[in-house]
A protein has these predicted regions:
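Solvent-exposed soluble domains appended to multi-pass membrane proteins
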Residues: 1-149
């Protein structure tokens, strides 16, 4: 869900900058997150798919803050959970591949045929997470749970 790509560039200009044709569905949002703390002795490199939705639970974990992960769409980037990036059109990226909702296709990173059960489970998870998130916002759920302040 990164939203800081070069808006002013056309796809052609962005492709020229990248050195290859840009994929406007998935690649345009590719970004990097760098967190720094004086308390970390050795660098930690996380090489999994994540999104800006994952920053809050990651910071909550690092600061030792308690939170109910069921009420948050993102995941702690430092957890052992596989990465999951959800796009507003229900397309998504996992550690195994990517699903394009506009074509209803799942492409495995290794080029193999996707397991239909895996794809169905991930698609259901994505649809549920989006529905829960929308319901939380539509019903002002956080105010109900935590009260107005």
């Amino acid at each position: 869900s990164a939203d800081h790509y070069p808006y002013g560039l056309t796809d052609e200009e962005y492709s020229e900058l990248l050195g290859h044709e840009v994929d406007p569905v998935f690649e345009i949002y590719k970004n990097t997150l760098i967190l720094w703390s004086a308390d970390i002795d050795e660098p930690v490199h996380v090489d999994k798919f994540c999104s800006s939705l994952d920053v809050m639970p990651t910071l909550a974990n690092l600061f030792g803050l308690e939170y109910d992960s069921r009420l948050i769409m993102g995941r702690d980037i430092l957890s052992d959970e596989p990465g999951l990036v959800i796009f507003s059109n229900y397309s998504f990226i996992t550690d195994k591949g990517r699903y394009d909702s506009t074509t209803d296709t799942f492409q495995m990173w290794d080029g193999s045929e996707p397991d239909p059960e895996y794809v169905a489970e991930r698609l259901s998870e994505v649809q549920n997470r989006v529905a829960y998130s929308a319901s939380i916002l539509d019903n002002d759920y956080y105010r109900v749970v935590f009260g107005a302040s």
